Amino acid sequence: FLRQLKEKKSPIIFGKGSQIRDFIHVEDVAKANIRAMNSDVENDFFNIGSGVGTSILELSKMMIKISKLQIEPIFKPEIKGDIEFSKSSIDHAKNKLNWNPEISLNEGLKEIINKN
């Protein structure tokens, strides 16, 4: 989406855009890894994400708004086998590592869109 928006082109969505994804800022991932390395927890697994599901359509609309463009996404046929729902359960990381994501999707999008 970012490349298309930088070229002032509509983002392309495959399917209806109802697919749910869990987006997280790389700084939050790094902080979670540092917490895990510095913890006393051994031989455990953690899901690291925002814990918030966002549809692809919603993501595209957020990015368009931040870009201040007057465009709409283009819809193309869905990709066979595409996962409909993917959202992390981060309770284990919250409880064992005392970790929470700090950067919202909107903040992260503003950062990357305004940076590039």
Roles of regions detected by a PLM:
Residues F1-I13, I66-K76, D91:
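A short C-terminal helix-loop "cap" of Rossmann-like NAD(P)-dependent dehydrogenase/epimerase domains
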Residues Q4, K8, A36-D40, K96, ...:
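Generic structural signal for alpha-helix termini and adjacent loop/cap motifs
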Residues V26, F45, P77-N100, S104-E107, ...:
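Conserved C-terminal active-site "lid" loop/helix of NAD(P)H-dependent oxidoreductases
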Residues D22, V52, S86:
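Residues that recognize and position ribonucleotide moieties
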Residues T54, M62-K65:
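Polyanion-binding surface elements
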Residues G17-I20, W99:
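Conserved catalytic core of Hanks-family protein kinases
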